[in-house]
Amino acid sequence: MPRSLKKGPFIDFKLEQRILDMNSKGEKKVLKTWSRSSMISPDFVGHTIAVHNGKTHVPVYVGDNMVGHKLGEFAPTRTFRGHAGGKAEKGGSAPKKK
């Protein structure tokens, strides 16, 4: 369920301040953050933010089409290794009829 418009978007204060400082200085550094629930604002566009996925920091380059989404949407927390081998590896499911 989306956040109430009355409250406004949640953006981590320290993260927003670091982005604004970098914008004023014209710097482009990778910022580490644990704030997966922060919403991406237009100030973030063009920066690379390393978002924590529970194990490591995943670098996320923020583009125009990402504004309004949350940082955690772009750093997956689970790795899909595929389903169990079984029938798919053996070469077929049913014998062919003549």
Swiss-Prot record:
One of its GO terms (molecular function) is structural constituent of ribosome. PROSITE patterns: RIBOSOMAL_S19. The keyword Ribosomal protein applies. It comes from the Bacteria. One of its GO terms (biological process) is translation. Residues 77-98 are annotated as: Disordered. Pfam families: Ribosomal_S19. Gene3D superfamilies: 30s Ribosomal Protein S19, Chain A. InterPro entries: Ribosomal_uS19 (IPR002222), Ribosomal_uS19_bac-type (IPR005732), Ribosomal_uS19_CS (IPR020934), Ribosomal_uS19_SF (IPR023575). Belongs to the universal ribosomal protein uS19 family. This is Small ribosomal subunit protein uS19. It comes from Chlorobium phaeobacteroides (strain DSM 266 / SMG 266 / 2430).
